Regions:
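ATP/NTP-dependent adenylation/nucleotidyl-transfer catalytic domains that generate, transfer
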Residues: 1-75
Length: 75
């Protein structure tokens, strides 16, 4: 539920391709590589962190590789 809410927040803020991975209470955000800079704009980044913490995550990170299909299937 927390992941779905986090992804919905990102979509509401203009990110059409998103993935939030939950590692316990830590959230890892994946957006396309070309959108990472947008995600890290200071105002948006602060709002993202505040929102994700309010959803129950204790930390938030951004995957600097970007959103890559099949990433978890790598050997």
């Amino acid at each position: 539920q927390r992941v779905g809410q986090a992804e919905a927040w990102l979509i509401q803020h203009g990110f059409d391709q998103v993935r939030v991975r939950s590692h316990g209470l830590a959230a890892r955000v994946e957006v396309p590589e070309e959108r990472i800079a947008n995600l890290l704009q200071p105002l948006l980044r602060r709002e993202l962190v505040k929102t994700f913490l309010s959803l129950g995550f204790t930390s938030v990170s951004v995957d600097v590789e970007g959103l890559v299909s099949g990433k978890l299937n790598r050997v």
